[in-house]
Amino acid sequence: MNKNTWIVGFTLFAMFFGAGNLIFPPNLGQDSGHFFWPAVIAFCLTGIGLPLLGVIVGALDKQGYVGSLNKISPKFSVIFLIIIYLTIGPLFAIPRTASTSFEMTVTPIAHTNSNLVLFIFTLIYFLVVLYLCINPGKIVDRIGSLLTPLLLITILAMIIKGFVDYSGNAPSHGNQVDYNSAIGSFSKGFTEGYLTMDAIAAIAFSMIVVNAIKATGVKHANQIFKQTVMSGLIAAIALVFIYVSLGFIGNHMNVDNATLKNLTAKYQNVGAYLLTTMAANSFGVFGKYLLGIIVALACLTTACGLIVSVSQYFNRIFPKVSYKAYTIFFTLISFILANLGLNAVISMSVPVLSVIYPIAITVVLLILLARFIPTKPIAQQIPIAVISIVSILSVISTNGWVKMSFIEALPLKQYSLEWFPIAVVATIIGYVVAKFVNQDHIVYQKE
């Protein structure tokens, strides 16, 4: 394993590790009580395992997901990837990284959230993002060699001090409704990891990883695939360490029921409260600055990864516009939305993400399956069409736009996994139908 693989791996870790990933584990630790380990193991399986799988699958075809999805349907490939890149990019996730950074750095330190201060902060924030992203060939070095070490050092400082301060405490009482047994805790942790939706980002980030590996001079498909796997494993191991550590500390922080009820009543995030408390108790006045640095770096690296991904994709399908022009355009859109109407954008984006997430996971699993089993396009088209319909109907019903009792009665609906048994059945049907359809088997291009 060479130096470049480590740099790419740590870059991938930093791109995945946004502010939400910082908040989820302590909250899980606090809620899981005496059943922490089943919960955190399950959380890592879906919260890290699915994104890792998504990155690896992106390296199966030399054209990445574009090539793999074109074999399902060229039109589906374009529509699906445009929706993914826009929703996790300038229309949702990127503006949110800026607003989250502002809320957890400037607001608690300067005690202000005025529109003028937000404007100045986001202007500086996106100028830094633009500088880091304008040259895609340098993005891996800039994140992997500079920002990631800073991010890891600050997180490790908080984790080490947190262990010293809290590891001697007994586990929290936890949420005894959702985490009342080892099996119940495992299923809840599994669902919570699934709901991070990082598997969608994996589809976007896989292009950066493959391009970065190619830029080092690696040309052979098998070597690109192996280095992608190794880089993904480096990122996954780092994420597991941090998730488990933050979760363990959150599990041993004693928070009384009155405080938890008060936070819930005010719609305040318990994970954010635990992090703030951990930082303040461990480092005093400096704690809020340390946490601010961690959040800012986590958000910045994620924003950079998303800007580069969306710009590279659009430059690939609409090459008449340069990569730099796309970078400037998407950064500008993100800057505007971070200052104007972000809540409205989020309210529109979340249902869209909820629709495409099951489709994205189904796509990843079908591509992986086709790598080992002879597969015709119809065998992939049928389950994707079925899951697309189920996902749309499920989101419509869940949001109360039109209540559908048959959707609400589906197995695993309470875990937002109602699509999975249907995907399994639809895939079996797809492979059976394929036996009677005259199509060539899918072959992924390696060279």
UniProtKB/Swiss-Prot annotation:
The keyword Transport applies. It is found in: Cell membrane. Keywords: Amino-acid transport, Cell membrane, Membrane, Transmembrane, Transmembrane helix, Transport. The keyword Membrane applies. Disulfide bonds: none annotated. Pfam families: Branch_AA_trans (PF05525). Component of the transport system for branched-chain amino acids (leucine, isoleucine and valine), which is coupled to a proton motive force. This is Putative branched-chain amino acid carrier protein SH1502. It comes from Staphylococcus haemolyticus (strain JCSC1435).
